[in-house]
Structure formats: C-alpha cells, structure tokens
C-alpha cells in the first residue's frame, strides 16, 4: 500500500497569530497563552490517565475531580461531568431522562444539534414560536401553549429545552420565565449554554434549570472537542447511572469522555474564565459600539436591540451593491478585510454576515470599525 503523506506534513494556521479573527464560533474558544504552556506535557493520547483508578471524573493528578467540583460552583449547579461538547451533553440528558417516543419542547432558535440529539435518542419534538423579523426572539409564553397542546393530545413530554443564546442572531432568551413554566408543569429543564457559559455569568440555580450543556471549544477558551454537562443532584441517579457490566463506568459518558488536551486546556483556562465573565458588561458595550458605528454605513443589525450578547448578525445591502460593480464580486469584502489583517468573515458573503469582537481590546475594536468604514467609503 502506497500513501503519499506529504500533504499532512507542516500543516499551518496563521489566522490567530497574524489577523484579528471575527468568527463568532471561534472568539470564545481562543486559548490564552498561559494555558498553552500548561498543556504542553499533555499532547499524547490518554495523557491524563497516568494515575487513573477507573473513571475520568475521579482523577486526582491532574486534579480533574476538584476542577469539576469547582466548575459546578462556577455554573451554579451540583454535579459536573466532562463531555465532548454541548451536543453530547444534550444527548446524555435526553437519553436518560426521556423515554423513547417522548416529546422535547424546544425553542424556535434551537441549534441543529438539539434536533440531531433528540433524533438519536428516538424522541419527538414540538417547536415553540419566536418573534418574526427582525428580532426573532424566543417567546416564553409559547412554551406553556405547546405544553398544554401536547398534554391535551395525550402526548408524553420528557424534557423542556431552551437555547440560552442562539448562534443565528445572538439573542439572549428569558431563561427564568421558561424555567418557571417548566417547574410549574413538572418537567425537567435543559439549558443549552454553548454560546453563554464561559462568556457571560451563569447561575443555574437562579435560572431554575436542571441541566446545563456547555461547550468548552466554543465559549470556554478550550481546545476541542470538549464540553460539560452540569446537573442538579436530584437527577444524579438517572443521568449518571452506571454500567451493570462495569460498575464504575457511567453509561451516558460511555465510561470516560475527554481524555487529553481538551480537558486540560479547559482546566488551564479556568482562572481566565472566572475573570473574563466579570467583564461581560464591557463586552456588551463593545458589541453595541460596533452596531452603532456600522449601521449608518448601510448595515442593518437583526436580532434583539440593543445587543445583549457579542454575536452580531448584519444584513448588508450596501455590500451587495458594491459587489455588483466590483470585478471580485462577492469576494471583495473578504479580500479587503484580509488586506487589513482581519479574518473570520466567510468568503463570498455580501448579503449578510455574522461577527463578534469578544475578547478584543478597545483599540482592536476601533481598528475593525474603521477598517470596515474605509472599505465602504472607498468602494461605494
């Protein structure tokens, strides 16, 4: 067998080193330099398992067990387990607290992975209503309506799921209202915090949630794949049931999950997370500044206003107009940004785009704003 492996050698990526990255799916997962130094010794497979007694969450060296206890405090929950991502966390809950054929009531902004997870768990779903263009906000009262409808139809409801912050518009849902509805109706409540936990303050108990699904690589300054599942103790027996064959292994975790760099990167970045969520108001302020400065150019921010999250989605008819006469067509914006050392915007997109300035300095934010202004003013 002959395989040419030259293409796999010297693979490089310079986006973070040489450019300002505006990709909202990546801004929250950028690992601080000090964390990169700590994880150097854990490159190898199963590197965290040197002193394992049979289960990942009980490892004392490195102190994974203590980290998970501290993370529970950070999220305002009782018990935390590492997973490979928020989608795996959601599936673990669905596959344990629901019975086959049950309904999951979820919001109209739910991520595709919520649907994939419930399909894999052989569940049905009922989608709640959201506001129409241009806000697209979740309507909490719709949960009560959909629950009543399913109950009247004698359908079994297994779970209430809410996307805390959706990836399309960056809207922050009213968790307390939905949580109150879930509690009053007597159903378990799962909050998808893929775009919130690690970026902004979260307290599960204050929010009335039973489960939190978090993403390490999306919002917690960690390498991927890595996530967390945080639960209330009342659901410990259901969600963390152990194997009949190997009594120490938890079924929904398939024994153990993140066994190397991802979990260590999350641990190494924990101090950074604790400090950065304290600056959330400043992140929102920077985001609102971007919107206020760019809308007069012909950008139209969609989603709730004013912004309460760092994800920004712009409709950009002005870019479409420029693309019609520019010989580069829809690629001009990407190329002009690249010339100015800015990346993370999808190539060829001019009708609309998403961006985030989360974690950037004020001077970097100003540079991004001024760069976009100069592109529009030069080419319009």
UniProtKB/Swiss-Prot annotation:
Keywords for this protein: Protein biosynthesis, Pyridoxal phosphate, Transferase
Catalytic reaction(s) noted: O-phospho-L-seryl-tRNA(Cys) + hydrogen sulfide + H(+) = L-cysteinyl-tRNA(Cys) + phosphate
Enzyme nomenclature, EC number: 2.5.1.73
Highest taxon of source: Archaea
N6-(pyridoxal phosphate)lysine PTM sites in chain numbering: 218
Record has Transferase as a keyword: yes
UniProt: pyridoxal 5'-phosphate binding residues: 86-87, 192, 215-217
Oligomeric form and interacting partners: Homodimer. Interacts with SepRS.
Similarity annotation: Belongs to the SepCysS family.
Record-given protein name: O-phospho-L-seryl-tRNA:Cys-tRNA synthase
């Amino acid at each position: 067998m002959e395989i040419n492996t030259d293409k796999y050698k010297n693979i490089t990526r310079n986006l973070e080193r040489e450019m300002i990255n505006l990709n909202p799916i990546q801004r929250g997962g950028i690992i601080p330099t000090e964390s990169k130094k700590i994880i150097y010794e854990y490159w190898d497979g199963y590197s965290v398992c040197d002193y394992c007694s049979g289960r990942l969450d009980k490892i004392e060296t490195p102190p994974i067990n203590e980290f998970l206890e501290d993370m529970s405090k950070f999220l305002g929950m009782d018990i935390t387990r590492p997973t490979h991502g928020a989608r795996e966390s959601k599936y673990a809950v669905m596959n344990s607290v629901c019975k086959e054929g049950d309904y999951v009531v979820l919001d109209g902004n739910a991520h595709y992975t919520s649907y994939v997870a419930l399909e894999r768990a052989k569940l049905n779903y009922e989608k709640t209503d959201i506001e129409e263009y241009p806000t697209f906000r979740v309507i909490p009262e719709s949960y009560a309506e959909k629950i009543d409808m399913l109950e009247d139809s004698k359908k079994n409801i297994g779970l209430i799921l809410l996307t805390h912050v959706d990836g399309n518009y960056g809207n922050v849902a009213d968790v307390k209202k939905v949580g109150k509805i879930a509690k009053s109706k007597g159903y378990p409540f799962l909050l998808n915090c893929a775009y919130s936990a690690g970026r902004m303050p979260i307290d599960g108990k204050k929010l009335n949630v039973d489960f939190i699904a978090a993403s390490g690589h999306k919002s917690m300054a960690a390498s991927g794949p890595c996530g967390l599942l945080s639960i209330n103790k009342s659901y410990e027996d259901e969600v963390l049931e152990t194997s009949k064959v190997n009594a120490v292994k938890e079924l929904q975790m398939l024994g153990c999950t993140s066994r190397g760099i991802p979990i260590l990167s999350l641990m190494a970045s924990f101090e950074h997370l604790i400090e950065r969520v304290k600056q959330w108001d400043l992140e929102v302020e920077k985001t609102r500044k971007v919107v206020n400065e760019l809308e007069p150019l012909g950008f139209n921010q969609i989603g709730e206003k004013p912004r309460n999250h760092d994800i920004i989605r712009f409709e950009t008819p002005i870019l479409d107009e420029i693309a019609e006469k520019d010989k580069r067509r829809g690629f001009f914006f990407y190329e002009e940004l690249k010339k100015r050392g800015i990346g993370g915007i999808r190539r060829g997109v001019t009708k609309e785009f998403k961006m985030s300035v989360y974690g950037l300095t004020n001077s970097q934010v100003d540079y991004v704003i001024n760069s976009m202004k100069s592109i529009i003013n030069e080419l319009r």
